[in-house]
Curated annotation (Swiss-Prot):
This is Argininosuccinate synthase. CDD domains: ASS. It comes from Staphylococcus aureus (strain MSSA476). GO terms for biological process: argininosuccinate metabolic process; L-arginine biosynthetic process; urea cycle. HAMAP family: Arg_succ_synth_type1.
Length: 401
């Protein structure tokens, strides 16, 4: 009896070629495809996997689990790698790895294969997660092992009658899920080349966006968006709704050269319409619901959390601890944020919360002012005392210092 290998199967070039390669190596291939909100026709993927020679194909709808257990932390933690990338692909990898391990254990497979190259981040994310969840499973990386170029893969697919949706003229590598869309390769590898419009799918070009703005009210409950204009949604449906609405206005395009875990720089084109709107609104709500010290410290945790996720360390003690901290900050992050969507911009123009720490009577400069300005004199004396003592001891500061 042949040994079984579970393959993370997407139906794209890398994994379609990998099926044939694993079969040639003498394995039975168990294909596994997850739906994490990308809108892919999974019936076609299922049929294609079997047509390619897989002995089984498991289709798993993990969209709700993805939104509730993973995207929720991206929102509560305002997660952005290098202050630019909302972790579109990185966010889905630990969930995919988890499901692959479950299928491998269910089918008595000896290992798990993926279609990642040897120069990308995903190989690390998948294999580190798999080792954390089940160290006895072997990892197989066909694309990394054969070290083919993208052009050689395409030629191999053509030679073996493997249907793929890309060609030499449009060799994009695309990954999409509920939280957004990532695109690389082809002309995008030149960091000075303007991305052509065929590199985008979720967002309109600015020239094609409406000339009238849409204004929405996004309601949050403990850090999670739950309503648009008073209508309640499950998180996954809310994100899909915002993707369509914000994408219509050209919101969420990101052109970023990022520092990969493996040490190289990579130019990526991302589309994340809902993510841009939600994260801006969430940050705005936090400005009135978090205390100053938490508001100043939380970004430090957010940066570390984003790097943990980007670097494939979701299943780690540190990440578990970071999640607990993030959760503890969100107890009172509830309320409404008003946002205008227009010509590529998500503009926050109002926020309110039953737990607001903003006191208008303390902030106002009108006659309603309740702030005790006399208290400022003593505060300044105490606050500036260390500087004053230092200056007296060392003779003060000159303009040259």
């Amino acid at each position: 009896m042949k040994e079984k290998i579970v393959l993370a199967y997407s139906g794209g070039l890398d994994t379609s070629v990998a099926v044939q390669w694993l079969i040639d190596k003498g394995y039975d291939v168990v294909a596994c495809c997850l739906d994490v909100g990308e809108g892919k026709d999974l019936d076609i993927v299922y049929k294609k996997a079997l047509d390619m020679g897989a002995v089984e194909c498991h289709i798993i709808d993990a969209t709700k689990e993805f939104s509730d257990e993973y995207v929720s932390y991206a929102i509560k933690g305002n997660l952005m790698y290098e202050n630019a990338y909302p972790l579109v692909s990185a966010l889905s990898r630990p969930l995919i790895a988890k499901k692959l391990v479950e299928i491998a254990e269910k089918t008595n497979s000896v290992g798990i294969a993926h279609g990642c190259t040897g120069k990308g981040n995903d190989q690390v994310r998948f294999e580190v997660a798999i080792k954390a969840l089940n160290p006895s499973l072997k990892a197989f990386a066909p694309v990394r092992e054969w070290a083919w170029s993208r052009e050689e893969e395409i030629d191999y697919a053509i030679k073996h009658n493997i249907p793929v949706s890309i060609n030499h003229d449009s060799p994009y590598s695309i990954d999409q899920n509920l939280w957004g869309r990532a695109n690389e390769c082809g002309i995008l590898e030149d960091p000075y080349a303007a991305p052509p419009e065929d590199a985008f799918d979720l967002t309109n070009a600015l020239e094609e966006t409406p000339d009238a703005a849409d204004e929405i009210i996004l309601t949050f409950d403990k850090g999670i968006p739950v309503q648009i204009d008073g209508k309640t949604y499950e998180l996954d449906d809310l994100i899909l709704t915002l993707n369509a609405l914000a994408g219509k206005h050209g919101i969420g395009r990101i052109d970023h050269v990022e520092n990969r875990l493996v040490g190289i720089k990579s130019r990526e084109i991302y589309e994340a319409p809902a993510a841009e709107v939600i994260l801006k609104a969430h940050k705005a709500l936090e400005t009135i619901t978090l205390t100053k010290d938490v508001a100043h410290f939380k970004p430090i945790i957010e940066k570390q959390f984003a790097e943990q996720l980007y670097n494939g360390l979701w299943f780690s003690p540190l990440t578990d601890s970071l999640k607990l901290f993030i959760d503890s900050t969100q107890q009172y992050v509830s309320g409404d944020v008003r946002i205008k969507l227009f010509k590529g911009n998500a503009i926050v123009n109002g926020r309110k919360s039953p737990y607001t720490l903003y006191d208008e009577k303390l902030a106002t400069y009108t006659k309603e002012d309740a702030f005790n300005q006399d208290a400022a004199v003593g505060f300044i004396d105490i606050y500036g005392l260390p500087t004053q003592v230092n200056s007296m001891l060392h003779g003060g500061y000159s303009n040259e210092q």
